[in-house]
């Protein structure tokens, strides 16, 4: 999926995450994480975001993630929403997304 514009999903409330995604002109994935639980879960959060991006077919993007203790399901949901908004996609392929949980 091609990232065409800047998009944001989520909030800075407790137990949530704000993801900002923008085009990166073919330079791969650049991920910046600011997390209140960085020392404990930083590597896991980065891996989860990158896995979600890969499943969506995103090969190049700049991602700024501000985590306030979000659960995995919230991190995935915010990443999916931000990618679809940034790519200009209006309809989600729920069957594909649901298959990730198998």
Swiss-Prot record:
HAMAP family: CitD
Quaternary structure and partners: Oligomer with a subunit composition of (alpha,beta,gamma)6.
Pfam families in alphabetical order: ACP
Purpose: Covalent carrier of the coenzyme of citrate lyase.
Alphabetical list of InterPro entries matching this protein: CitD, Mal_deCO2ase/Cit_lyase_ACP
Organism superkingdom: Bacteria
Keywords, alphabetical: Cytoplasm, Phosphoprotein
Gene Ontology CC terms, in alphabetical order: cytoplasm
Main location: cytoplasm
Location in or out of the cell: Cytoplasm
Residues carrying O-(phosphoribosyl dephospho-coenzyme A)serine: 14
Family stated for the protein in its record: Belongs to the CitD family.
Protein name: Citrate lyase acyl carrier protein
């Amino acid at each position: 999926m091609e990232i065409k514009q800047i998009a944001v999903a989520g909030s800075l409330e407790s137990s949530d995450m704000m993801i900002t995604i923008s085009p990166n002109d073919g330079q791969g994935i650049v991920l910046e994480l600011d997390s209140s639980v960085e020392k404990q879960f930083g590597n896991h959060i980065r891996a989860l975001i990158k896995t979600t991006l890969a499943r969506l077919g995103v090969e190049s993007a700049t991602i700024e993630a501000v985590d306030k203790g979000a659960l995995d399901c919230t991190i995935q949901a915010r990443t999916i929403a931000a990618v679809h908004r940034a790519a200009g996609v209006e309809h989600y392929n729920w069957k594909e997304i649901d298959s990730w949980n198998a």
